[in-house]
């Protein structure tokens, strides 16, 4: 009995020692947080084609997430360096270490979450159609849109394309490479409809007379946006989440948002 008790106690002690060692290793494991500060720069991947979040303008970028990226870099005490990417390359660029964070209206999805971390969501969004105003009454639901005569246009490689292919089985789908001029194709009568994030279609409705967002406050699909982070780096994610929390609590986030949306 005494021997059995000693074995049990030894097992418990070994387990506690292993847990303590694991905790220490987790606490001392190198983090991108340290690398960024040593480097003196935060490398931010962004597509530059998604107004009002990120838009490439004459060699620089502007938008909600561009200003927030600068805020994050300032909180880290480093310079913000932007790296242009494409929607189809986001996960590859994050996995290769090309960037420390990806920002620019990126939807949080379970498929993406399998490969990367995301910050806490910073915006609730969802997919909504945008059409010529004369056609607004025709395209109220997925069923209204999914007809053989409907021409749906979509940018490649992101959640817009995934939504379109998952939900429209009869409509004609055209993949158009330029997410900046894609809305002009609808105005020109070369396509009937595009489905994008509700905030984007609201902005485009204001920017392009003749286009109307369809029920943007009642989107076809619920969605959230977050900042894409390297998988496994809990220390860096904790810093980004706390920075985001403070940006919202202090009103900095709202001020930047209103600058581009209101």
Give a label for each model feature.
Residues 124-131, 198, 202-245, 262:
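Periplasmic-binding protein-like
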Residues 27-105, 114:
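Extracytoplasmic small-molecule ligand-binding "clamshell" domains
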Residues 133-151:
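Flexible hinge/capping segments at coil-to-helix
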Residues 66, 82-92, 139, 174-188, ...:
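Short helix-initiation/N-cap motifs at beta->coil->alpha
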Residues 89, 105-114, 163-166, 183, ...:
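A ligand-binding cleft/hinge motif common to bilobed small-molecule-binding domains
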Residues 54-56, 69-78, 141-142, 146, ...:
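Ligand-binding cleft/hinge of the Venus flytrap
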Residues 1-14:
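Bacterial N-terminal signal peptides that target proteins for export
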Residues 27-31, 159-173, 213-216, 244-262:
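Ligand-binding clefts/hinges and TM-proximal coupling segments of bilobed small-molecule sensing domains
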């Amino acid at each position: 009995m005494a021997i059995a008790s000693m074995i049990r106690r030894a097992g418990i002690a070994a387990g506690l020692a292993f847990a303590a060692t694991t905790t220490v290793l987790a606490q001392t494991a190198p983090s991108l947080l340290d690398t960024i500060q040593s480097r003196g720069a935060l490398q931010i991947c962004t597509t530059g084609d998604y107004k009002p979040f990120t838009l490439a303008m004459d060699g620089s970028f502007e938008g909600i997430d561009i200003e927030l990226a600068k805020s994050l870099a300032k909180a880290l005490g480093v310079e913000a360096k932007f790296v242009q990417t494409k929607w189809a390359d986001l996960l590859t660029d994050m996995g290769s270490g090309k960037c420390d964070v990806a920002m620019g209206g990126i939807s949080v999805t379970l498929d993406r979450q399998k490969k990367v971390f995301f910050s806490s969501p910073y915006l609730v969004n969802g997919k909504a159609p945008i059409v010529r105003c004369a056609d607004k009454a025709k395209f109220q639901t997925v069923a209204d849109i999914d007809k053989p005569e409907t021409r749906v246009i979509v940018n490649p490689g992101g959640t817009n394309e995934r939504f379109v292919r998952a939900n429209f089985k009869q409509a004609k789908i055209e993949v158009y490479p330029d997410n900046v001029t894609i809305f002009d194709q609808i105005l020109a009568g070369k396509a009937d409809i595009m489905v994008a994030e509700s905030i984007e279609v609201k902005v485009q409705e204001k920017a392009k007379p003749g286009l109307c967002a369809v029920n943007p406050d009642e989107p076809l699909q619920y969605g959230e946006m977050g900042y894409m982070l390297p998988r496994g780096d809990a220390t860096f994610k904790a810093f980004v989440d706390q920075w985001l929390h403070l940006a919202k609590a202090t009103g900095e986030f709202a001020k930047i948002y209103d600058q581009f949306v209101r």
